[in-house]
C-alpha cells in the first residue's frame, strides 16, 4: 500500500504531520488465550480515537505471540485506524531479519511509520556496531522511522545509556524522522538529544512533566507512545488538552489541568518498578488503567509482568481522586469487555 510520503520526503512529512499524543495498543485475546480477539483490538482502536489521540502504537512485543500473530495484530490495528489516525508499530523482534520482515509487513498493510529499536537481548560489541545494524534495518524499508534508544545494553559506552555521538549520525539516515527518549531517563538526556539532533529530526520525550520545558523551549510537537488513556476519558480528555494548550503557548492553563491530575500520577507511580530491571514492559497495568476508563481490557499471554492487587487499587484510587469512576466488574477486565458482553466469564474448577 502506498505511503503518504517518499523516503526522501519522510523528514519533511513528519514535521508537518506528527503532532499531538501517541498511545500504545496491546493485543487482546479470546478468554482461553488461544486466539487474537479481533473485536477487542478494534474496540481499543476506536476508544483511542474517541479520546483525541493522534497516533496508536501497536506493541506486539509486549507478550507471548507467534510472529504470524504479531503480524496479524498489526494488520488489524492498521485496518481499523486507517484514514483516521496515524499508526505505528514497535519493531523489536528477536532478530534483525524478523525486524526487517516486520518493517516490510507494516509498509505492505499501510501503517504510517515504525518505532524501531533493538530486542532486549541485543549485545552490541562497539558503537559502530549499533550504527551499522540500525542503518541496515532502515535501508530495508521506505517507512518513516522513529529511533528508540530504550532497552539497550549500551551503558558501557556512555553513562547516559546511549553513546551521544551516534545521535546526529542516526538522525542523518534519510528515513529516520524522530527520536523517542526512553521513559524514565534523565532530563539531561532529553536536553542532550534536543541539542544534538532536533535541527534534523523531531525529538519526543513522553514524560508529561517535561513538556512544560520541551514544548515551549525546544519545540516538541509530538509525544508518546505513553499510556495517557490511563488519566483521561473521551468526555474528559485532560492529557490531550494539556499538550494542545502547551502547543498554543497557554502554559498556565495547561499547568492548572496538570495539577488536577496530581493524585492519579501519585497513585500510578512506581507501577513500573517491578519490571524495569528485566527490560520487559508489561502490558497489564496499562491495559488495566485503559479498561478502567473504557478500553477493552483482557489479560495477555506469558511472558508478561504480574498485575498485583495493590497496583490495581492504586490505579482505581487515583482515578477516583481525579473525578473518574473506574469500571466494574473486575471479572470483565480478565476476559475482555467485548467477550464479557457476549457472556464470557472466568472458568471455575471444582474437584
Please name every model-derived segment.
Residues 40, 44, 69, 73, ...:
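General structural feature for long, well-ordered alpha-helical segments within catalytic domains
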Residues 4-7, 109, 171, 190-206, ...:
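A short, hydrophobic/aromatic-rich structural module that often spans a beta strand
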Residues 2-161, 303-306, 325-350:
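Active-site beta->alpha loop and helix N-cap motifs at the rims of alpha/beta catalytic domains
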Residues 136-144, 149-271, 275:
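Catalytic alpha/beta core domains of metabolic enzymes, predominantly
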Residues 52-53, 111, 175, 250-251, ...:
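Residue-level recognition of short, well-ordered coil/turn positions
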Residues 213-351:
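Structured C-terminal cap/extension of enzyme domains
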Residues 20-22, 202, 285:
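Generic structural signal for residues positioned in beta-strands
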Amino acid at each position: 500500500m502506498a505511503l503518504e510520503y517518499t523516503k526522501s520526503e519522510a523528514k519533511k512529512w513528519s514535521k508537518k504531520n506528527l503532532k499531538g499524543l501517541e498511545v500504545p495498543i496491546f493485543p487482546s485475546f479470546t478468554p482461553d488465550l488461544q486466539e487474537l480477539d479481533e473485536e477487542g483490538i478494534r474496540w481499543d482502536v476506536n476508544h483511542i480515537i474517541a479520546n483525541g489521540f493522534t497516533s496508536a502504537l501497536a506493541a506486539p512485543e509486549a507478550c507471548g505471540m507467534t510472529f504470524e500473530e504479531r503480524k496479524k495484530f498489526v494488520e488489524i490495528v492498521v485496518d481499523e485506524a486507517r484514514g483516521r489516525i496515524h499508526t505505528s508499530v514497535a519493531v523489536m523482534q528477536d532478530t534483525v531479519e524478523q525486524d526487517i520482515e516486520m518493517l516490510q509487513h507494516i509498509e505492505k498493510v499501510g501503517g504510517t511509520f515504525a518505532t524501531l529499536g533493538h530486542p532486549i537481548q541485543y549485545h552490541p560489541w562497539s558503537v559502530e556496531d549499533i550504527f551499522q545494524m540500525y542503518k541496515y534495518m532502515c535501508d530495508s524499508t521506505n517507512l518513516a522511522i522513529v529511533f528508540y534508544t530504550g532497552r539497550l545494553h549500551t551503558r558501557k559506552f556512555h553513562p547516559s545509556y546511549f553513546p551521544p555521538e551516534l545521535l546526529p549520525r542516526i538522525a542523518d539516515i534519510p528515513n529516520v524522522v524522530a527520536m523517542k527518549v526512553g521513559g524514565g531517563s534523565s532530563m539531561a538526556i532529553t536536553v542532550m538529544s534536543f541539542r544534538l539532533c532536533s535541527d534534523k529530526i523531531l525529538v519526543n520525550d513522553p514524560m508529561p512533566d517535561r513538556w512544560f520545558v520541551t514544548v515551549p523551549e525546544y519545540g516538541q510537537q509530538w509525544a508518546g507512545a505513553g499510556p495517557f488513556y490511563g488519566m483521561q476519558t473521551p468526555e474528559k480528555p485532560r492529557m490531550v488538552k494539556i499538550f494542545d494548550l502547551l502547543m498554543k503557548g497557554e502554559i498556565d492553563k495547561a499547568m492548572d489541568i496538570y495539577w488536577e491530575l496530581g493524585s492519579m500520577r501519585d497513585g500510578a507511580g512506581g507501577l513500573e518498578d517491578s519490571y524495569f530491571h528485566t527490560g520487559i514492559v508489561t502490558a497489564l497495568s496499562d491495559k488495566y488503567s485503559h479498561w478502567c476508563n473504557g478500553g477493552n481490557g483482557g489479560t495477555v499471554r506469558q511472558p508478561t509482568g504480574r498485575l498485583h492487587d495493590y497496583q490495581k487499587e492504586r490505579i482505581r484510587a487515583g482515578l477516583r481522586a481525579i473525578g473518574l469512576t473506574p469500571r466494574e466488574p473486575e471479572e470483565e477486565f480478565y476476559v475482555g469487555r467485548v467477550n464479557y458482553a457476549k457472556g464470557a466469564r472466568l472458568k471455575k474448577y471444582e474437584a
